[in-house]
Amino acid sequence: AQADLAHAEESLSGELQPRLFYALEQLLVTPAISPFMLVKIPEEPEYLQWLANETRTLHQPAATLCGVHYQVDGGKISLTPAHTAEDNFASVAPVEAADWIEAEQLFGCVRQFNGEITLQPGLVHRANGGVLILSLRALLAQPLLWMRLKNMVARQRFDWLSFDESRPLPVSIPSMPLSLKVILVGERESLADFQEMEPELSAQAIYSEYEDNLQIADADTLKQWCQWVWQNAQQLELPGLSANAWPLLIQEGARYTGDQETLPLCVLWIARQLREAAAFCEGEEIRAEEIQTMLERRLWREGYLAERIQDEILQEQLLIETVGECVGQFYALSVIEFPGHPRAFGEPSRISCVVHIGDGEF
């Protein structure tokens, strides 16, 4: 079984995220329904990098080089179509991703020093002819950037504009053709805010989601999840799990999802378990003893508040009777979640029955 995990397919993403991959194919392979795509996915660098890597596997670069070559001659700037990848505004990386952007990073800039003018490309130039993946959080915080980007994608033309309205560009710069597909990623709240700001575009854009969990229906599905964890360990350059360590990780995954038949596909959760367990690993694989040590240390590290509740019971500041019997009184376990605390814990509560005369109304 361990050998099967090590010799898994290059990528399981297509099998574990079929809806998302179908949406990517609609955007990239088939005639585009819309140049924009919305994806519900955590706005973290690890997820954006994963999405960029999977998009590269589906994206087919154009037969001809995209972009132009800007020639600066004193105060005059001209452009010609790009002939080599070394041209200053030729597109060499068809898929670009960023979780936060500034105007200069997205659209490039014009620099002038000692009378010499230079043009610096931005993300839209490097992704010309391909795909640009951006975080909705960054665009919602800077609506002017979004309006300019949307306009350029719709018109298929990049216009050089000054970021400071009080200081125009020192020279006139010819516009360049732009062929770009944009994937906007965000959590549910960001998508809702974007839909309110752009209702028509949201209705026309291709939509899909990253599925956080995997329903374990049979042994094959469980094997796929184990292969997914193994591939994440290889990408992070961390040791894999030994055969006796898998039950503990599966149990912790079920505890995380709250369902014994559901396991997480969250790359951040998987990376955290592997990194913390690797700190105790002394061999080539992470063993069950090292997983258990990691979980016990984490419980102790995060268990201050839970221990204080236990101390109150032991010191009889919180009276919890565990012997004898009493009519109309019983105990329940309340789940306590403190803001900012990573772990929920249980607190016993006494519930007493109170009887009183009613007021005669239903």
Regions found by a protein language model. Name each.
Residues 1-201, 206-218, 226-243, 247-289, ...:
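Conserved ASCE/P-loop NTPase catalytic core
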